[in-house]
Amino acid sequence: MDAPLFRPLETFLGLPAGLPGPGSRAGVLGVPFDCGIHPFRVGAREGPAAVRHESRLIRRFHPLIGDADVPALLRAVDCGDVAITPGKPAEAFPRIEAAALSVLDAGAVPIGIGGDGAISLPLMRAAGRRHPGLVALHIDSHTDDYPADPADRYNPTTQFTCAAEDGAIDPALSWHVGIRGFTFRSGVLARSEALGFRVVAIDELLARGFAQTIAEFGEAVGGRPVYLCWDMDVFDPAVAPGVCTPSWGGLSAREGIALMRALAGLEIVAMDFNTVSPAQDIGGMAAGLCAHMIAEAMLLLAGRLGLLGAG
């Protein structure tokens, strides 16, 4: 019998399992963590497994863009999940940061799969240590820069506050894009602006168009290293129901893909995709869309590295 008797454990897109080796340009990093404090929707810690599972439906070639085996061109690997305990950020965050540093030090771009939005902080810290002058492009329906209580600093509403205050990113050139919906308190946008962030609400984004908006961001950052944080609740719950904090009036799947493709040319050095919560998902919709967005990001990375056409 020619076919192997056993299948390997499930990895994203069936990638080889392990740490990046020579020539690897991308390393998928599962971050099965949530703070466990949402009053209604807990479960993003199961996001990495769900996204990997739904990635079985993603094909490796895109005949309209490059027509190449992009994961193979990137020599991408799935590093597995960071060994952490959900609900304990003070213990988990240094381990997440160390895991991301191991990918960065191997010369690869870490692609984090969360996990709730809090995972972005240790990943940004790692990227900021290796890429001075890091700026963030935060695609989300929420700003996630609420005031941080010194006694309980880490939660999925404060990661960009902490990143700005800790110097992991330069908030003066970092943008929140896609912001919409109701909030628990007043003054949310004023706080973002006081920290230095540019806020692009979803109505402005759609009115100006993705290309023009991202071109303005690219001109502002001037080739500086970019951390891409993609919160899946930027999508409308109609296409991504299984997220931690859904907000109506979001992007369609087609719009999200178009926005991702508009990022071509940015110097993205690390990224994460967060907030998939399988317990609230319907038929794997949010997890499957997240898997597709990661595949789109890999295509974007291959293009930036000049690998398309090399296969």
Features from the language model and the residues they span:
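Conserved alpha-helical scaffold segments that buttress catalytic/binding sites
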Residues: 2-311
